[in-house]
Each structure stands twice: as structure tokens, then as C-alpha cells.
């Protein structure tokens, strides 16, 4: 079964949100790094300010996502998050702690709102999610450069974000039609729900009622496989960056490689099949990352391949909970910060090593492959999204 074609609006919207995503990330990171370097509150250091920002921006996305979905606030969350990103760049002194909190919460709210709307409008495809998340890597790189060097004017980003807030309020009202209808927030029900565009043919959301409790176990197992795969990739990704030497080439090369990987990964997965493209990319990245030895010639292609699986993972998690798009976007973000947390400390960095990376990448690929195969067996592979062109829908779905 072929997926229906996306409307022009559904193709255009992820790109617009992706551009705002880059601006939001650049603003938040630049403001946090600059504030931490130039203003201290007690023993608040640059390290803890940036770490606190990461924990707020990514760690809170799961609980905030539950609230956003429950109250149907995806569009509101996106607008408020964009406005908060503009606030941290507003003229005038802002304490480092306040900057960290406003930037972290604002960044998370934008991710949940815009990411949830993109997932809901993607029609079961991975490419729109990749188009949305990819520019964030460029924004992160730009924000780190601006924050560390103190160079680059923040006024253009501030005014661009202010304009984006006005545009989202006045011009983006069609996004309201993607909000779930009343009563569709009940997580233990199946189906695509609400007024969302075409979604996976079946949902693996945990069932409702004591007589169906056994079905909760495979749902949780699939979800944990996807999230553990993300957490492991987060740890290895930080390790790959840690091994690279400093300098302008790394500051530019790593964000560009991550951008291209996320952008092209979703497109290639939709074309070649999610399982084939995602696990293949991870396995191809294994020798490049594990044995790069800090060489950018090997590390950058490895990072590109490594990052190409994020879009598939996001849409696969959404396939498990299609009535909860913001939560589905927030859970992988929580896994990202969980995987990166050990790298905040010297003891965690001691785990970096080529054979550790070999084992972890292989484990991540196996977890992702197992999850995608099980999703296919449960009716989410009646087209070419999961297994590719050779294993089309009817054979991939049990009769």
C-alpha cells in the first residue's frame, strides 16, 4: 500500500519550522553560553549553566509533552517557546540562572509544539521529521560559536524570532486543524485519532482494561528498544565529538555533518525502507567512528551516517502513540539527555574507547532493527516505509 501524497502545506511547513528551529537553538545556546561566561550567581559556572540548560531543554520535554498533548496546546507551545527564545536575546542584563531557565524551558516548548505538529502532519513519513530537526544542528553550532567567541551580532536573530512569533500567530492558523479532537487524548486507545493526517494503519498504544494488560508488555518493550537506541547513540555521539581536535574545521564540520545526516536520513529511509536505511547507516558508521582516532576524514562521514537515524526513530515512537505527538517527540529528547549525562563527568569520559564504541553502536543498531521489525509485524509496514521495496506491505504484515 502506497502512502497518499503530502499536500503542499505539509511539505512546506517542516521547512519553515526547521528554519525557526535553527534560530531558536542558536538564540538559546548563544544566550546561555554568553551569560555563563560573563555573569555568575554564587558558584554557578559555565559547565553547570550549560548542563542545566540541557537538562531543562531536553529532560523536561517528556512531562511537558504530556501536558501539551493533554490540553491540546501544541501550537501554543510552539509560539510561547519561540517568544521565550527571543526574550533571552532581548537587550538588557539578565542573570545567568534566569537565562538558563528561560532558554531551557523555551527551547523545550518549541520542540514539543513544532515537533508535534510536524509528526502529526507527516503522514507516516520520516522525511518531514528530518527536515525539521536537521537545522537545529546548524543553530547549535552557530550558538556555540557566538557564545564562546562573543562575536556575531544577536540582533538579527532577535528580530527574526520576533517576526516568527508574529507570523506564527497571524499566518499559521491552519496548524489548528492538526490538533486532536476532544476525547482523543486517552492514551490506552488504538487508532490514529483526532483530525490527524493519514497515520500508521494500526496503533500499538497500551490497551485499556485489565483483560488486555498483557499487550502492555510488547508496547513497553518496543518503546524501550527505540529509546535505549537513542540514548546509546547520544553517548557515542558525544564521544565521537570528544575525540575530534579543536579548531574551526571541527566547529563547522560537525554541525554540517549532523545537519546533512538528519536531513538526508529521513529522505533515504522513506525511499529505501526504514529498516534497511537506518540499521545500514549505523553499521556503516561503526568503523568510521570507532576507529577514526580523531581524524576528521573518517569522523565527519561517520557522524553524518550516525545522525541519519533520528528522523526514523522519532516517527517510529510516534507510531506507538499517534494521539500524543508532543510526548512522542519529547521521549527521544529525554533519551538524548539521559545518554549524554554520563559525559558531563570525567568518569563518563573514561568509557570512551574504540571497542566500547563498537559494542554500543552494534547494540544500538540491533535494538533499532528489532524494534522496527516488530513494528512491521504489527501492521505498520503495509507499504515500503519499513522494509524497503523488496519486502512490500502484504508480506511484511501477518495475515
Indicate residue ranges for each PLM-predicted region.
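Conserved MFS/SLC helix-loop-helix module at the cytosolic interface between two early adjacent transmembrane helices
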Residues: 59-91
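C-terminal transmembrane helical hairpin of 12-TM major facilitator-type secondary transporters
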Residues: 276-313
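Intracellular juxtamembrane helix-capping segments at the cytosolic ends
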Residues: 108-123, 307-322
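Central cavity-lining transmembrane alpha-helices of secondary-active solute carriers
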Residues: 47-68, 252-264
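Glycine-rich segments within core transmembrane alpha-helices of 12-TM secondary carriers
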Residues: 125-147, 329-346
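Symmetry-related core transmembrane helices of the 12-TM Major Facilitator Superfamily/SLC fold
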Residues: 154-173, 355-374
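Pair of pore-lining "gating" transmembrane helices in MFS-fold secondary transporters
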Residues: 2-38, 47, 212-236
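Cytoplasmic membrane-interface "Motif A"-like loop-to-helix N-cap segments
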Residues: 69-81, 270-283
